From Swiss-Prot:
Pfam families per the UniProt record, alphabetical: Rad60-SLD
Keyword Aminoacyl-tRNA synthetase carried by entry: no
Organism lineage string: Eukaryota, Fungi, Dikarya, Ascomycota, Taphrinomycotina
Protein name: DNA repair protein rad60
Domain of life: Eukaryota
Chief location of this protein within or outside the cell: nucleus
A GO CC term attached to the entry: nucleus
InterPro entries, alphabetized: Rad60/SUMO-like_dom, Ubiquitin-like_dom, Ubiquitin-like_domsf
Originating gene: rad60
Amino acid sequence: MDNLDEDDLAFFSKPIKKPPLNYAKQLIASSSDSEEESELDTNKQALEHINAQKNITHNENKSAEPLSRQSTILDADEGNQDVSDTTPNACLNEGRHSPKSAISCVTQPVSPVYNTRAAANLRNNSINSEAALSTTSSLLDDDFARRLEEIDRQVQEFEKSSSDMDVQIHTHKREIEEDDDNTSADVPLLKHSKSDHSTLYHSKSEFSTNEPVISVVLQLAVIGQRIPNSNISLPRDWEAPLFFKVKSNQQFRRVRIAYSERKKVDNVVLVFQNQRLWDYGTPKGAGMLKVDTRLVVHAYCHSDFISLKRIKELEVEKLSSVTEDSTAQTCKLITLLLRSSKSEDLRLSIPVDFTVKDLIKRYCTEVKISFHERIRLEFEGEWLDPNDQVQSTELEDEDQVSVVLD
């Protein structure tokens, strides 16, 4: 029994090596309620009381007093029914005694059963506290993991929303660039090669800026035109001009529709400087700004415009045919240099269908001599037949021909 008491006391006398508290355990230890702190204080006071009692018991064993041993055995058999043991038990379980009562408790003899129960109580309290700490730490770990998952989910949602926003921005930017390209379709871009991309980028950037475009207001006088021998019935005020104020970037479609409604004539065609103005065209694209801001535009009925176009084509064909005839006639002339020992040299231009005899007559007329059959022409040592045409001979332009006068 004495060995058992010493082992139990040795268990409580040895220092307990506890692992260092982590951050979660420190939070739990700092946030514990007043009841747990009171229990820890009770266990600490009980441990101090047991150490003091150990010294007293060791001294009593050395003195070998049989009465104390006998009382100890009887207390163990009676199951802690002695009234004298109530005060230490109350001091250990409740821990509410004052320092004076603690001294009185130490001076009274304590049975080994009391020591065993105190050790079991302290061991159970330590196990329960460790279990509570492990359970609380596991709960904190689960909470921390859930918070990490929530943060990851928020990050993924942010990345997804940012990618969708980038796609919308790029789509909007592409639409703006397409609108700028359509607006600046009539404006010529700078010349560039395949290898020179900087020039093309610079030319596009000039028209894609957000600076406001200053439009010029033009005054157009639209006058109706008639063509001769036309079978189209037109209103009496067809040739009366109508004035329109048009911006430089405004399409001609509005002008044409307004003029047609005012004159009550369908299929009107607008013409400026012999060029048709299409509905999608603008004054800036038609080059009106280079001429003036007050201009005259001619209006034709569509059928009259087709007839006028055909007449102009015929005139162009006729003019080209006349030019071809004059060019052909010019090509049929040949220039020859005629030399004689009895007269001066003479340069003549004659058609190639002339005969050699006609060439001789022309020469006699120029030098004012009488024509006779004995006058002959020699070219490169050969006599030319008077009945041959010039184009059938080997004569070419600027050749020299000798005239022999007999």
